Curated annotation (Swiss-Prot):
Pfam families: Hydrolase (PF00702). It is found in: Cytoplasm; Nucleus. Monomer. Belongs to the HAD-like hydrolase superfamily. MasA/MtnC family. InterPro entries: Enolase-ppase_E1 (IPR023943), ENOPH1_eukaryotes (IPR027511), HAD-like_sf (IPR036412), HAD_sf (IPR023214). This is Enolase-phosphatase E1. Its EC number is 3.1.3.77. The gene is UTR4. Binds 1 Mg(2+) ion per subunit.
Length: 241
């Protein structure tokens, strides 16, 4: 069955895996203290607060939001352990948005990925691209809205048909998440849908759900075992599709 829909992972697939851990995460941790310093009472935060930071933090367990230091320590620990926490993702998305908008941040999407995203979609042939990342949908839209192309910031969101994250589809190593995506994009079968990721556990989950799925190998990605190399289809560039 011909592929008419591609679901893309982000880090390690369409942009360097180092961008998130060496640029986005440190930027978030650098800016977070100044935002927390503006809050005088962490115990009385409300979900309907007009301040988006306060509204996000109100979702934290009461035992965490006792003080600035407690909240800061909590998020530092989550980032250090790379925990995919929905509240953390919301907060990161808000702070990264400011960074993209003021020019501090620009996404280093691979040239082959930029070209693929621009050329694969076709309304006449009903070809579509979706994004599925552990980062929040807001963070995904931001990243693709501020892509570094030859030193200029370009917006690739117009080429994308939709986005999924752990709150809308589920965790990426669970096959049920890919079944949910197939349902949401109107696909009864996954044979015409290709999922690309650097993570073999995610690729395996997509295959279990009936999708086609390849492992993407990029500089800096975790090395594959010999078994992985024989078990999965592997590409090193989206030009190979």
């Amino acid at each position: 069955m011909a592929i008419d829909t591609v679901v893309l992972d982000i880090e390690g697939t369409v942009c360097p895996i180092t961008f998130v851990k060496e640029k986005l995460f440190p930027y978030f941790l650098e800016k977070l203290p100044s935002f927390l310093s503006e809050i005088s009472n962490f115990t009385s935060l409300q979900a309907d607060d007009k301040d988006p930071i306060k509204a996000i933090l109100s979702q934290l367990p009461e035992q965490i939001r006792t003080s600035k230091d407690s909240v800061l320590e909590y998020f530092n620990d989550l980032v250090r352990r790379d925990i995919k926490d929905p509240i953390l993702k919301q907060l990161q998305g808000f702070i990264w948005k400011l960074g993209y908008e003021n020019g501090d941040l620009k996404a280093p999407v691979y040239e082959d990925s930029i070209e693929f995203i621009k050329t694969f979609p076709s309304k006449t042939e009903n070809k579509r691209i979706y994004i599925y990342s552990s980062g929040s949908i807001k963070a995904q839209i931001l990243l693709f809205g501020y892509v570094d192309e030859n030193g200029k910031s370009v917006d690739l969101n117009e080429y994308l048909s939709g986005y999924f994250d752990i709150t809308t589809a589920g965790f990426k190593t669970q096959s049920s998440s890919y079944t949910k995506i197939l349902e949401d994009i109107g696909k009864e079968h996954g044979g015409s849908v290709l999922f690309l990721s650097d993570n073999v556990l995610e690729v395996e989950a997509a295959l279990e759900a009936g999708m086609e799925s390849y492992v993407v190998v990029r500089p800096g990605n975790a090395p594959l075992t010999e078994d992985d190399k024989t078990k999965y289809k592997i590409i090193t560039s989206l030009e190979q599709l």
